[in-house]
């Protein structure tokens, strides 16, 4: 049945056509022009470097001090030692000396902690070995 339907249809050129010569009002022409297109710079813009920006140059400070009441030092950013009096770790340490163990002879986790650590390590090693075995030719 499909072949009879397809054979009864004949593909004819459509009577609907677009006349490329006539232009429609209000629409731009789609034809390409043969004129070449060039880009030219308008001129060279010089950067002024005689007076630098920042605290040493372009920043206007009221009464000669910044918002924290300090006079400018000529640097654009604060230095941690000058601003805080110490390195950042002096005020926000990542460790606390009171939490340290008095000696390193005894593990703080005890026997249970060591057993959990050993089982985790053995599981990771066994899992890795199983992955290597399953992806190798030995598993075939």
From Swiss-Prot:
Residues 1-41 form a transit peptide. It comes from the Eukaryota. InterPro entries: PSII_PsbR. GO terms for biological process: photosynthesis. One of its GO terms (cellular component) is chloroplast thylakoid membrane. Disulfide bonds: none annotated. Keywords: Chloroplast, Membrane, Photosynthesis, Photosystem II, Plastid, Thylakoid, Transit peptide. It is found in: Plastid, Chloroplast thylakoid membrane. Its main location: plastid. Associated with the oxygen-evolving complex of photosystem II. Belongs to the psbR family. This is Photosystem II 10 kDa polypeptide, chloroplastic. The gene is PSBR.
